[in-house]
């Protein structure tokens, strides 16, 4: 390989914890151009395949035309690179920041070396498009006269709204929160995705004709029947926002929060007053225990540290993953390897050790005499294969209990599905996983003219999957309205 992989440089952990801004210094344009040259333009580009292997995606679910725009970056044709990128992805400004880069995990270069830095090429393309004016608003020339309501302004709802508006339908997006963006706005901290990036795109969508209504909770503030009367079609894109709880003794202790509420309050206070209103969960000088080893748990680690937590511990039920691919996890499968994310890096820098405790779960929340949380009892787990089902099952290890000091606990244990009142308001059926039920591979619900998309449809997932769902749902809605669809979704 003529050129070595180069990526953006992260600010030193001890410096970046002093602020809540993005903290990567990206490559200059010429160096980024050379990174495009590393792409081999494979005859079978696994990077854009988006196929499921062993229940996990390999390659980009959006089927981004990765080899094409990598080559266009290398040849310096930035505008055409942007055009090819936007053909399959409505929001590269989001995915180039928060996607785990499924494309890179499936890159052929990664077989015997370092994969192409596709995610950073994507970032360079979209940011160059904004600086050069390529990303300006392009309102549809013709309107169909059809009206569509999209309920929820997360990545899936926004993707559906964007495509349906491009088709010429009049789209109104309803958001129950005070700001547009859903998960992007309040579920992802500012240091991963600065909120002005979301606002920048929303303002373009407004110029293109999309209407946004915030602070309106459909099913409560406005009846579902009114929307069904006022609009030709309704798209439910409300996410999977029902958090999984930890029902251990002492759960009623003061100081236990769901991670999603913790992160939302933090971002809202940051945007409203730069934390001067004090309307966030204060972790300064406190021992914080985070239950959950995923991305949300990591975001809680980074956020707690920025507020001056005395200590941060992250509890993970699963065993620690290997540092390199195991023999039974070959390319191009998603690599099940140990990842140390930005929050954990910061914890190591501040406290001198990795915050994670593996193969453990909470046994009890311990309260003081006033009902305040003062400690957490955890227990070690062992994992064994059930001979009857072949599935792994966990067992507590007797005598392995441990007490952790904790004034704050943040539960980041995933989500159980959508808020039931929304489904009830429209009368749509739910499946056994409490997601809205559709015919497999389709987006029409059990109620006429009501469609569903995103996490509300497939369950908790990645932003890139949400965008794909939104695009496919838009195609289904358009076909329902017009009898055919000329929307290109992949």
Residue spans of the language-model regions?
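Feature captures the FAD/FMN-dependent oxidoreductase FAD-binding
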Residues: 80, 142, 147-151, 199-249, ...
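Immediate flanking context of iron-sulfur cluster ligation sites
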Residues: 24-54, 78-102
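Glycine-rich Rossmann-fold phosphate-binding loop(s) that bind the pyrophosphate
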Residues: 152-155, 292-294, 455
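FAD-site-proximal beta/loop scaffold in flavoenzymes
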Residues: 254-285, 384-460
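A conserved FAD-binding loop/helix module that cradles the flavin
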Residues: 297-300, 307, 453-487
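C-terminal catalytic lobe of FAD-dependent flavoproteins
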Residues: 4-6, 10-30, 35-38, 43, ...
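Beta1-alpha1 glycine-rich phosphate/pyrophosphate-binding loop at the start
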Residues: 2-9, 13-25, 34-37, 61-75, ...
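Glycine-rich dinucleotide-binding loop and its adjacent helix/turn
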Residues: 124-142, 200-220, 243-307, 430-442, ...
């Amino acid at each position: 390989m003529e050129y070595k992989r180069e990526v953006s440089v992260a600010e030193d952990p001890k410096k970046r914890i002093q602020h809540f801004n993005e903290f990567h210094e990206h490559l200059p344009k010429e160096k980024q151009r050379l990174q495009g040259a590393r792409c081999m333009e494979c005859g079978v580009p696994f990077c854009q395949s988006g196929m499921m292997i062993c229940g996990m995606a390999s390659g980009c679910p959006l089927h981004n035309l990765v080899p094409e725009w990598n080559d266009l970056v290398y040849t310096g044709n930035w505008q055409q690179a942007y055009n090819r990128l936007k053909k399959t992805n409505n929001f590269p400004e989001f995915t180039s920041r928060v996607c785990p880069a499924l494309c890179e995990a499936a890159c052929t270069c990664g077989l015997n070396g370092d994969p192409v830095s596709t995610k950073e090429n994507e970032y360079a393309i979209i940011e160059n498009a904004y600086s050069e004016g390529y990303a300006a608003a392009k309102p549809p020339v013709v309107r169909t006269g059809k009206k569509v309501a999209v309920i929820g302004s997360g990545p899936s709802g926004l993707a559906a709204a964007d495509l349906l508006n491009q088709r010429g339908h009049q789209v109104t997006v309803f958001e129950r929160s005070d700001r547009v963006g859903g998960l992007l706005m309040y579920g992802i901290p500012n240091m991963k995705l600065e909120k002005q990036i979301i606002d920048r795109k929303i303002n373009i969508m407004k110029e293109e004709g999309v209407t946004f209504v915030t602070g309106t909770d459909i099913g409560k503030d406005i009846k579902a029947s009114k929307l069904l009367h006022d609009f030709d079609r309704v798209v439910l894109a409300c996410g999977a926002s029902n958090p999984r709880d930890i029902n251990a003794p002492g759960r009623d202790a003061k100081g236990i929060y769901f991670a999603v509420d913790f992160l939302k309050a933090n971002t809202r206070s940051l945007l409203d007053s730069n934390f001067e209103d004090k309307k966030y969960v204060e972790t300064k000088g406190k021992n914080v225990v985070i239950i959950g080893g995923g991305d949300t748990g990591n975001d809680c680690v980074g956020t707690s540290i920025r507020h001056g937590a005395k200590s941060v511990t992250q509890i993970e039920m699963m065993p620690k993953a290997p540092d390199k691919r195991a023999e039974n996890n070959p390319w191009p499968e998603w690599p099940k390897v140990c990842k140390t994310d930005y929050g954990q890096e910061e914890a190591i820098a501040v406290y001198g050790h990795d915050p994670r405790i593996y193969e453990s779960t909470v046994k009890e929340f311990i309260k003081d005499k006033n009902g305040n949380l003062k400690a957490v009892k955890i227990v070690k787990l062992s994992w064994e294969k059930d001979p009857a089902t072949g599935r792994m099952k966990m067992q507590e290890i007797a005598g392995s209990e441990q007490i952790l000091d904790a004034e704050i606990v943040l539960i980041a244990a995933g989500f159980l599905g959508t808020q039931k009142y929304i489904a009830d308001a429209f009368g749509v059926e739910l499946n056994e996983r409490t997601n809205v039920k559709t015919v497999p591979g389709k987006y029409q619900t059990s109620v006429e003219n009501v469609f569903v998309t995103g996490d509300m449809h497939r369950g908790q997932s990645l932003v890139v999957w949400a965008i794909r769902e939104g695009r496919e749902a838009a195609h289904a809605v358009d076909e329902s309205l017009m009898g055919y669809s000329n929307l290109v979704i992949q």
